[in-house]
Amino acid sequence: MAFTATVFPAEMTKEVFIGAKGHSTIAKLSDQTPIPFSGTDVMTFSFDGEINLVGENAQKGEHTNSNDSVQIRPVKIEYGVRVSDEFVKCAEEKQLEYLQAFKEGFAKKIARGLDIMAMHGVNPATGSPALTLIGTNSFDTNTDVTDITYDASDLEGNLTSAVAAIGDYENTGMAFAPTFALGLAEIKEDGISQYPQFKLGANPGSLNGIPCDVNSTVSAVAGEYAYVGDFKNAFKWGYAEVINFDVIEYGDPDNSGKDLKGYNQVYLRAEAFVGWGILDGAAFARVETSGS
């Protein structure tokens, strides 16, 4: 079974992103939309006031509203691993085992990467701000997202303030850092735990009927503790249905200073294209330490 530059079969690409959805907070709380390589525009409308009841032959009234479009442009993400050059020599069944393990690992990396990029606006590999590729398209860098100052002694107050900050938007989801979730588990009233579902690092999936997720990606950047908002209606994400896959046998493709042939290795690299868009930053609030 010879490998060169190729793409994952459509079914395998689908499996990768199904796997990613199971590990990504963003994917769990928001809806996915198909994204072509050229990107897509999502129309947004601001409908102020209420509908007008009109009688027969009556004059229709003026309505105050506005509309805009949010661009969702896919960005390229890549991940690669070095494996023994036995990969290119072994039987097809063994190669498929390699690919299955790689596919599962890549799905988890996509999930974590999507969260870190959309939440914090940084390159997941380096932690550096991605000013050109992401810019203000993240919760930490979008100036319309409300900042709530973290108070470890009043986590319930933090969440109440966050929900109040999003105004008329619906609170459809909450993302918690593990530290925040464990803090909720410690809250007691008259000696009774108020949020026992978060004890021992559990991830219950909902809080008072509202979807939530506990994930270390929330605190991947120091000082971030929680995100609250209308994930279902004011945030979209998606992927282009092609994953490029290369088996590289020569050179130093990961710039590690180690020649592949010199170490009897080959390099497996996958590239995917994901995109997301915050339709209105005012629909979200983040709980953070001041100045983070």
Where are these regions (language model features)?
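Short, Lys/Arg-rich flexible segments
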Residues: 2-6, 10-27, 86-93, 111-118, ...
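Extended, compositionally biased alpha-helical segments that mediate assembly or anchoring
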Residues: 250-292
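Short helix/loop capping segments that flank catalytic or ligand/cofactor-binding pockets
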Residues: 52-54, 82-83, 91-92, 183-186, ...
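Extended oligomerization regions of viral-like shell subunits
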Residues: 146-259
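Assembly/oligomerization interface modules of large self-assembling protein complexes
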Residues: 2-80, 283
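Structured loops at beta-to-helix junctions and adjacent beta-edge loops in soluble globular domains
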Residues: 45-48, 84, 177-179, 215, ...
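Alpha-helical scaffold segments that mediate packing/assembly in large oligomeric complexes
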Residues: 84-165, 286-292
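Short, Φ-rich (hydrophobic/aromatic) sequence segments
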Residues: 12-25, 98, 102, 106, ...
